Amino acid sequence: MSHADMSDSSGFNEAAAAFSWNGPKKAINPYLDPAEVAPFSALSNLITLYAADNEQEQLRREELSEQVWERYFFNESRDPVQREMEQDKLISRAKLAHEQQRFNPDMVILADVSAQPTHISKPLMQRIEYFSSLGRPKAYSRYLRETIKPCLERLDCVRDSQLSASFRFMASHQGLEGLLILPEMSQDQVKRLSTLVAAHMSMCLEAACGDLYATDDVKPEEIRKTWEKVAAETLRLDVIPPAFEKLRRKRNRRKPVPYELIPGSLARMLCADWWYRKLWKMRCEWREEQLRAVCLVSKKASPYVSYEAVTHKREQRRKSLEFFRSHELVNEDGDTLDMEDVVNASSSNPAHRRNEMMACVKGLELIAEMRGDCAVFYTITCPSRFHSTLNNGRPNPTWTNATVRQSSDYLVGMFAAFRKAMQPKPGCAGMACGWLSRTMTVLCTGISCVSCAKKTAAPLLHCCVSLPSVKTVRNWAITRGHALSLSGLRWYGVRVAEPHHDGTVHWHLMCFMRKKDRRAITALLRKFAIREDREELGNNTGPRFKSELINPRKGTPTSYIAKYISKNIDGRGLAGEISKETGKSLRDNAEYVNAWASLHRVQQFRFFGIPGRQAYRELRLLAGQAARQQGDKKASTPILDDPRLDAILAAADAGCFATYIMKQGVLVPRKYHLIRTAYEINEEPTAYGDHGIRIYGIWSPIVQGKICTHAMKWKMVRKAVDVQEAAADQGACAPWTRGNNCPLAENLNQQEKDKSADGDTRTDITRMDDKELHDHLHSMSKKERRELAARLRLVKPIRRKDYKQRITDHQRQQLVYELKSRGFDGSEKEVDLLLRGGSIPSGAGLRIFYRNQRLQEDDKWRNLY
């Protein structure tokens, strides 16, 4: 290129740089340049939407045509070629799986896990996938062989123990096949199954009756034999029939047969609701035991109880709260009480329950201090055959498929045998059969009492020998199996039932006893606690039994047991403490413990050796009623005529459990207590036609008559809905919350009036226009903005007083006339009761109530409550 050409091109570039229209144009290349996008408009958007809809419709039609084609043409029944292809495909898959399992045994375990129900396979597969993601094939294979495979074997054993031979026989009946998969069912499925079981029991009753009721001459024993046949069918389902112990056949019956219990028992066995409760409880327990078998209830998974059971308990608590909030209690006078307030004021409130127990334990401590007794803390654990999972989360090889309920029954039986051994043998007044005495005789075979020897005509050898010490005699009696408490050892205290991390029950006991009897009681209790499977302990009995003498210098017995009471109720004051067994907060564990106790029906707390606490509650209730009736009288005015009974009442009213025990007769058997709980038969029948027993009040053997503490009878009814409020919430702008927070202007105006009356000179923002409000808000400081936000959030709820339906005078006259036509008085009291949401009994178990401006009659309360 010449110098002139270069100068011309430079001039051209300068001109192009000066004027954009004079620059070179870009070459057109459709493969590299993006396509020009049309400008967006309403029409283009509409066209795009139509195109998308057409595309979706085309896809839907193609999918539908494929489904129709596969259903009517390419299926096994219509196309033999397709059937052969499907069979070949299944056979090839089975062969491939067999080859894989032959070369890789872990595939067999995975296939077995996948074949389990969802509540078993899903959590296990999550753990298997976690180990697979670690990238350690040997650890993954070892986990499958050493943990998952034993879990599946234990699961099969648990299922075999749950499905007994009689249970399988009942499942063979038509329609009852669902009994075999009871743990896998939902609530709706269990309800349907319970209806079928109730129908089967009805058919059994009809078959058992036959021509029995064709004549009027039917003997009660024949009716009982009919009941036996229905009860036998119920026992096949591992369900104990109602009143079974009182009605069953006994060889040596001391009391006459209560034939009046047969109708109520039959009504329950023929009721679908009764069967639903039994089957649902059985389903939950079986499902939980299956989860325990596969190690899903442990410190490594979910401590104490499965997460599914905790979730169910939360939902049950939520439904209970909704039920309490939607119902109220109404008495004969028309007075109403909110049911939620009543429940929170009772012992169902965890705080009240904890306070009452702490007061009782404090009373025991004061009694022990006065008597000079010592306090010992015991811990008793079940043998290893009751524990399903080890501390490391692996299956326990010594577990014998024992359930949580069986572990609780083991401890109850052990404790009953121990207490029986502590009772004095009647008729014995000597050394080993009565109170210890240093006056004894010596036999050639050992030591015995004179009275027993005379009764049995045993040869006595009266010798003047040196008598052994009391300690030597105690140790000899224990080793000889005499359970030396034949000497009448006395103790009292409280026991707490707690779960291990795998749900197995263990006990903590706070016991008070005489100092001289501590060693004998401890040795006797250790003997009963370790007598089963003794060989697995060796010389160390600590894993099964522990005892610790409470040192007053370190802490009182009440302070020692307070932790165990709190962490088994609501975890109050234990948020900062961590459980050594689970590694979680004790307050968080309280929810799991409550769900565990509710599911397995384990009694968490039990006092023994002291007067009953129900009479203590009734006395406190009586004292409160008397205080309201006395009014302005002096507080020291006696309530009961007998001074001894009034002293017990005063002690209970003051909340001093120690004084209450002293006034009741100290630590004596219940038959010697001065005040006891009185019961009566309920007047109104239950839904099954029988009459239950309810608490009446108190009674005393030293005076005649009973004192009623439940004179007022309350009925549980559903809260009536205010018609005006319900109509106001039906508009198009009805709020979704309970209180209407819109508009805020009225609320703010009312607040500004209140502030101005108090001398508040803040600016009224409701009278500003948009510009003034904008400037004012941007000029506010952070403190003023926080105050404004708090004022905007402040909405006073509308409090509604006792509800009463509003009707016109004409409607009231119609109501009175209709009441009189039905045989009622039509008085103002009856009208007011109906308008407040109450009801009036109309006979035959029915009740009449007023709703939607008319009288209605049904058995709603009888069926539901």
Curated annotation (Swiss-Prot):
Question: What GO MF terms are annotated?
Answer: endonuclease activity
Similarity comment: family membership: Belongs to the phage GPA family.
Question: Catalytic residues per the record?
Answer: 560, 564
Give the InterPro entries listed for this entry. Replication_gene_A-like (IPR008766)
State the Gene Ontology BP annotations: DNA replication
Q: Which organism is this entry from?
A: Escherichia coli
Full protein name: Probable replication endonuclease from retron Ec67
Skewed-composition ranges (Basic and acidic residues): 751-783
Alphabetical UniProt keywords:
DNA replication, Endonuclease, Hydrolase, Nuclease, Transposable element
What EC identifiers does the entry list? 3.1.-.-
* Coiled coil location: none
Region spans: Disordered: 749-783
- Check the record and name the Pfam families matching this protein: Phage_GPA
